[in-house]
Regions:
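Conserved ABC ATPase signature
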Residues: 128, 169-173
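Conserved catalytic motifs of ABC-family nucleotide-binding domains
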Residues: 190
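Catalytic Walker B motif of ABC-type/P-loop ATPase nucleotide-binding domains
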Residues: 194-198
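ABC transporter nucleotide-binding domain
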Residues: 212-300
């Protein structure tokens, strides 16, 4: 999408340097407790009690040019705080970060022209105006020359098939339609780094799939560096090769999707479709955790024993069909959240790379 005949004037990141580098980044907030009851509330006006909340706890992260990284975690894990820090919206309590060689919270003009932030629950489009008007305002803010603006706008609009929406007030659009136009606005100035904060939240399956295809295409073509925060595994599986799992402000895992299965599970799921509902006692004698659903049996078998035990199971049960699968990623990550486990990360602290 970027026309090589119109090169950027921004200084590139030095060769060998990561696009994003974060070291010991932490953010703390002081919150005031609100006592219950009228008298307690009045007393609290003169004797306010506060406590410190750690939104981010000494995070280390290194992201190279062209990586598409998913940051997965439950609500309150620190994902949005992390993106706000990298965007320069807030400043850290301690630690350091550079994005494209700049310190984000210094908010230099050069830095602001080279990244974009899209938040699924925040609008950057003017609510009462058509998106086309917001796009023109965006053009002036980022000083995009007219030929480049029109070329980029038309390409993005056609990719998302939203041309018919451009003249409708944003308030009249569905959530999915609005999010598509938010992405167009964010990409008009052709940023090198894109931060996406839960862009698919609240969207139906069709809208999610459309955004997945668009983001995969644009990221590959532009070689943008992207960090996507989400709590949907579908976003991760569709878009990212690298996964960062966070909870309570700390990194539990940083690595590939394939590695997380090997490191955090020791078994596979074997599903047997039988001719008839099985004898429970016979299934229990197999000695594996199991679930029976009519004529279907679901076993959890140690991955190192599959080849040894599966032939015997198939001979004795009247099996019509069998499948062997890894434990679903959703289940693995949910267990990580419950246990707070850092086993299997690339570093001793759970903050690899």
């Amino acid at each position: 999408m970027h026309n090589s005949s119109q090169p950027r004037t921004d200084a590139p990141t030095a060769a060998g340097e990561p696009v994003i580098e974060v070291r010991g980044l932490a953010k703390e907030y002081r919150v005031f407790d609100k006592p219950e009851g009228l008298m307690a509330s009045v007393t609290g006006l003169f004797n306010r009690k506060s406590r410190v909340v750690e939104a981010l706890r000494g995070v280390d992260l290194r992201v190279e040019k062209g990586e598409f990284v998913a940051m997965l975690g439950p609500n309150g894990a620190g994902k949005t705080t992390f993106l706000k820090l990298l965007s320069g919206i807030i400043t850290p309590t301690r630690g350091s970060a550079t994005v494209l060689g700049s310190v984000p919270w210094e908010r230099t003009d050069d830095f602001r022209r080279r990244f974009a932030l899209v938040m699924g629950q925040r609008n950057q489009l003017w609510w009462d105006l058509p998106a086309a008007e917001s796009f023109r305002l965006h053009k002036e803010i980022y000083r995009i020359d007219t030929p480049r603006f029109e070329r980029t706008r038309d390409e993005l609009v056609d990719l998302l098939d939203v041309r018919k929406l451009l003249l409708r007030p944003v308030r009249d659009l569905s959530l999915g339609e609005r999010m598509k136009l938010e992405l167009v606005a964010a990409l008009l100035h052709e940023p090198e780094v894109l931060f996406l904060d839960e862009p698919t939240i609240g969207l139906d399956v069709v809208a999610q799939h459309s955004l997945h295809r668009f983001l995969a295409h644009v990221q590959a073509e532009r070689q943008m560096t992207v960090i996507l925060t989400t709590h949907y595994m579908k976003d991760v599986a569709a878009l990212c090769k690298r996964l960062v799992v966070v909870t309570e402000g700390s990194i539990l895992y940083d690595g590939s999707l394939e590695q997380i299965v090997d490191r955090f599970t020791s078994h596979k799921i074997v599903t047997l479709d039988l001719d008839a509902p099985p004898d429970r006692a016979a299934i229990d004698r197999l000695g594996f955790p199991c679930e029976i659903r009519g004529p279907q049996v679901i076993l959890r078998i140690d991955r190192t024993r599959i080849a040894d035990v599966l032939p015997g199971i198939l001979r004795g049960q009247g099996v019509r069909d069998v499948s062997v699968e890894d434990v679903p990623l959703e289940e693995i990550v949910a267990e990580m959240f419950r246990s707070g486990s850092t086993a299997g990360t690339d570093g001793a602290t759970g903050a690899p790379r």
